[in-house]
Amino acid sequence: MAIATADLFDSHEDILESCETQFRSYGGRAAFHGPIRTVRCHQDNALLKSLLSTPGDGAVLVVDGGGSLRTALVGDLIAGLGVKNGWAGIVVHGAIRDSEAIGGLDIGLKALGSNPRKSTKTGAGEADRPVAFGGCTFTPGHWLYSDADGVVVAPRRLHD
């Protein structure tokens, strides 16, 4: 079910945060929503892969890659793990790769851009802590809604 971020903002402006970052949409789902999980990692995707290997239960993984476009944090295999394990979407404050293949996957995926260079895999980073970028704080357990107009965050679920 698509939920328009503009309509949500009109109805709940007092509690919503709107992310100012202009993401590109890469996944097969143009609109997605779910409870937030987070990972902070810089040019290393081992922790991100580990999280997407667990049941997502319709959650959205917000990845704070520090805005780096130097290496890709998500490729088609990692995005495929998200599909297999029931994640609704991934928002990457960084780069992805395998963009054409990701476009055929049933998952929402937004990122700053793409780069074919793979990341390191040491496991550096931290999970399930608040992360912030684009004037917005992404807190685990809060809700993220995304569509063609952008990304908004609410402290609770806003739809039936």
Swiss-Prot record:
A matching Pfam family: RraA-like
InterPro entries: RraA (IPR010203), RraA/RraA-like (IPR005493), RraA/RraA-like_sf (IPR036704)
Cofactors: a divalent metal cation
Keywords, sorted A to Z: Lyase, Metal-binding
Record has Metal-binding as a keyword: yes
Binding site for a divalent metal cation: 98
EC number per UniProt: 4.1.3.17, 4.1.1.112
Any single GO BP term: regulation of RNA metabolic process
GO molecular function: 4-hydroxy-4-methyl-2-oxoglutarate aldolase activity; metal ion binding; oxaloacetate decarboxylase activity; ribonuclease inhibitor activity
Matching CDD domains: RraA_family
Main enzyme class: lyase
Catalytic activity line of the entry: 4-hydroxy-4-methyl-2-oxoglutarate = 2 pyruvate; oxaloacetate + H(+) = pyruvate + CO2
Cofactor binding notes: Divalent metal cation.
PANTHER family listed in its UniProt record: 4-HYDROXY-4-METHYL-2-OXOGLUTARATE ALDOLASE 3-RELATED (PTHR33254:SF4)
Family from the record: Belongs to the class II aldolase/RraA-like family.
Known function: Catalyzes the aldol cleavage of 4-hydroxy-4-methyl-2-oxoglutarate (HMG) into 2 molecules of pyruvate. Also contains a secondary oxaloacetate (OAA) decarboxylase activity due to the common pyruvate enolate transition state formed following C-C bond cleavage in the retro-aldol and decarboxylation reactions.
UniProt name for this protein: Putative 4-hydroxy-4-methyl-2-oxoglutarate aldolase
